[in-house]
């Protein structure tokens, strides 16, 4: 078949196979060069991919809900998630797909398995069943941009694959960096699986229109994977900052008493007891602080809790408590003299604990048992709100904590530094950055590298 052009000159017959490449080239060029409508005049349709979403209580579920609320102020959001699996009381009957609508937000749950997360094999089955059902469903969901988070740990690869099939831009919001986390946390052994996973992950990073990370330390990790620096953006989780004139929330004396007990000085780790922490350094250091009236209290749960409880059975100044309800967070934060944030060596930039921002907003000092390359250590020392014991030195940790516990003036200075730093990481400002990234990605056309 032949086609004809007419441009005022004598007509010329051109083979069709020569037209098609030209058209495709023009389409590619127009995706980046054509004038666009103002970004904020039209709603954007966002497809968010994450296995967990409330009522699940994982960190990614809570953050996904926060991001969705910010997006839904102006945009239409579809959340493609799995069945709840955290709380047995929230389990739901199996259906292939279940849909809920709330304003501009549609929550579409695929019929993934909901095994308890305590056994790794069953957790992996939850992951795979979610991917098996979510990918084909995503192909038929209208959207302008895909936002992929990191549950399951290979969700970024799933997002890149879906974006490729749908010919849509995609933003990769990395909460924990995999497979680095799995290998560094001894969940996956170095070998063929890790190498294939890493290769696919690097492909997903290159395909992303933007890669959103939680800190400068994580950004450095991503850049080391040969990703274009222009596309890697830091958006911190931040914390809600109460107005200066707002009254302080009432504190629950029972919560405070449960945490403090009879200790003179309380170091508190509140959060997940996962594979990333320098837990043995904490326990060994705490044992040498028993005669100083210093208590180490863990509030929370996680894969390492049973091992830690067993290891601490003979350490009298170490205590484990379950999570408190969400409305008691201010009391939990207030109960401590200083808060622990820990990352073991080798995982700097792989995991970025977002609890730092809530601690800052509460005006509490931080003991960052982490490599100095970590944001919590480097920022904390620069701004004066943290001390940073070596994560491999229990004696050094104990010495710094002992000195801090005997120096009320230093504690006050660090607490004041925390309050001064907190507004720099105000959550609504960070969320606006993420919304802006998604708006721009949606109007830029698909990424074609």
Language-model regions: role of each:
Residues 83, 217, 238:
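Carbohydrate-associated surface elements
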Residues 92-98, 244-260:
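A short helix/loop element that forms part of the nucleotide-sugar donor recognition site in Leloir-type
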Residues 250, 392, 396, 409-438:
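A charged, aromatic-enriched C-terminal amphipathic alpha-helix characteristic of glycosyltransferases
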Residues 39-101, 449:
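N-terminal subdomain of nucleotide-sugar transferases
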Residues 291-297, 305-330:
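Nucleotide-activated donor-binding/catalytic signature segment of Leloir-type glycosyltransferases, i.e.
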Residues 135, 142, 154-157, 161-165, ...:
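Membrane-proximal helix-turn-helix segments that form the acceptor-binding/catalytic region
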Residues 258-277, 283-286, 297:
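Conserved donor-binding/catalytic core segment of Leloir-type glycosyltransferases
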Residues 277, 325-334, 339-360, 365-378:
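Nucleotide-sugar-dependent
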